[in-house]
Amino acid sequence: MAPPHAVDTKQPAAVTEAVKAAFAGIGAEASFPLLERLFADVTGMFAGRYPGYQAIDMQYHDYEHTLQATVCLTHLLQGRSRSLDRPVLRTRDWELAIMSVLLHDSGFLKKTGDLTGTGAKYTFVH
């Protein structure tokens, strides 16, 4: 995988390809359809194409922030997988980690009819 700063986190397709390259590095090409669907769903979520919900309206917790976190986590997974530490991370561990980072701000989604405030109101502390 390219160094984190070399991945254009303003472009979901660039991050998707970087993550897929990392998965290929551990022989997990079978995860590609899952990753493609996940990135497509999360892109739609942030853009307001998730049925019954608005686009995420947070200034910092935007899609680029999520993509930046995804690139960073992917590098952590790669480093951990090259180490001799145990337990060994399996493909499913990688999948769950990427799902988690991509969805970590989904709690900020507001329902379509909710017109007051931002999604931050759904957190206990923000």
Label the predicted regions:
Residues 1-56:
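Non-catalytic interface/linker regions that flank or bridge core catalytic/transmembrane domains
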Residues 44-52, 72-82, 108, 112:
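Short helix-loop boundary/capping segments at the starts of domains
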Residues 54-96:
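Alpha-helical phosphate/pyrophosphate-handling elements in metalloenzyme active cores
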Residues 39, 70, 98-100:
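Generic structural concept
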Residues 92-126:
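Divalent metal-dependent catalytic cores for phosphoryl transfer on phosphate-bearing substrates
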Residues 12, 31, 81-83, 100, ...:
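Generic serine detector
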